[in-house]
């Protein structure tokens, strides 16, 4: 049980770390080497209450038509889904889920919000103040409500939209490995005694 909790914590931490890096790259690409005030202004727009601009590839302010485009296609959210796929690649069929990675998308979305909030002063402050470490954690306690809230939108995603999201992930990582770099998927020997072991129910 303890190991399962540890693995879940490591999974969340990896997604949060990869998204934090992707947010930094996105802000530098978008704002250039501009002053912290420019980054702060941009982050404020992305996180503006009632807008959730950070969830979109193109916001209402960037679009020529003044509309939002590309829900869940922001590059840092795609980076989070990429992390999920890399960590779960090569799992035995019995452990894989046939549906779309809704939970991973929810985690990626709120991890992006968390990472952007670290830039509200125009520079990344996450991890800077050790006395504030508990309030910066990417934990269920701090981010559970946000994760459940964003799931409401995720449950409405159509199969066609999921294909767009997964295509964007494939483009973001040049080669999506079918197995993790350090391991290969195991084959099954159905003639092995371990596979043939069986005991019928006794009276």
What spans do the regions from the language model cover?
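Helix-rich alpha-solenoid scaffolding regions
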Residues: 1-54
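Long, contiguous, well-structured interaction cores
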Residues: 57-203
